[in-house]
Amino acid sequence: MQVEETSIEEIQTKIKRLNSKAGQMKMDLHDLAEGLPTDYTQLMDVAAATYEIYRQLDELKQELKKLENAK
């Protein structure tokens, strides 16, 4: 049971960090989109990085839900 608690806490900490990073990436993507066509060459890289952060966040949230339901 102690192992599960630690895992849940670790995942919650990772989710908090990723949420913060994801919010910043979302704002960066928004700022880049507002400035189009200037810096359009960066669009795909920023979009891909933003997608990856949100994919990781979704994965962690699903893992957390499984651990919480297993209690």
From Swiss-Prot:
Gene3D superfamilies from the UniProt entry: Helix hairpin bin
Entry keywords, A to Z: Nitrogen fixation
- Cross-referenced InterPro entries, in alphabetical order? Helix_hairpin_bin_sf, Put_N_fixation
Annotated GO biological process: nitrogen fixation
Q: Which family does it belong to?
A: Belongs to the UPF0437 family.
In its UniProt entry, what is this protein called?
Answer: UPF0437 protein asl1434
